Amino acid sequence: MAIREILTVPDPRLKQVSKPVEGGVTDDIRALMDDMLETMYDAPGIGLAAIQIGVPLRVIVMDLAREGEEPAPRYFVNPEILETIEEKKPYEEGCLSVPDIFDQVERSARCRIRYLDYDGKQVDEWAEDLYAVCIQHEMDHLEGTLFIDYLSRLKRDRAIDKVKKAKIRAIREDAN
């Protein structure tokens, strides 16, 4: 397993649409998911899409366990949202690709999803609350959409500028 670099805005690769995984869940895909999970835990975060580490495949990892609980990793290959309920709720979201930025985004409180798990088994289930929000957020990444794309242009531009400035500060600090 290896910790990979997480892409941050305004990296254009984050706007790519990810391709389906062909040939099922192979050892290479499992190795990718293992790296993604280690990267996500190191960040730390609760979800990560493969495109966030520069791999344009429809793969997501997630762990919604609270601090102090046993890890509960989940793996999603070629996930699809089959159905959502009409009721939407605002949730405060953040993103490892938009570090230190948080804002309200409206999402369906419940959605039905289908995906292949770590072992290649097809799963069809309903996701609710934080699970529903997180899967929708991560699946947006697979379509090249970031949570800040739901914000006003002003808020989005400010978020990108803040991330750019933080990168410049970090580079300067590393140089000293």
Swiss-Prot record:
Positions that bind Fe cation: 95, 137, 141
Catalytic reaction annotation: N-terminal N-formyl-L-methionyl-[peptide] + H2O = N-terminal L-methionyl-[peptide] + formate
Transmembrane segments: none
Molecular function terms, GO-annotated: metal ion binding; peptide deformylase activity
Cofactor binding, per record: Binds 1 Fe(2+) ion.
Domain of life from the UniProt record: Bacteria
Alphabetical UniProt keywords: Hydrolase, Iron, Metal-binding, Protein biosynthesis
Enzyme class: hydrolase
BP terms from Gene Ontology: co-translational protein modification; translation
This enzyme's EC code(s): 3.5.1.88
Function noted in UniProt: Removes the formyl group from the N-terminal Met of newly synthesized proteins. Requires at least a dipeptide for an efficient rate of reaction. N-terminal L-methionine is a prerequisite for activity but the enzyme has broad specificity at other positions.
Protein family according to the UniProt entry: Belongs to the polypeptide deformylase family.
Name of the protein described by the UniProt record: Peptide deformylase
Organism for this UniProt entry: Hyphomonas neptunium (strain ATCC 15444)
Gene label: def
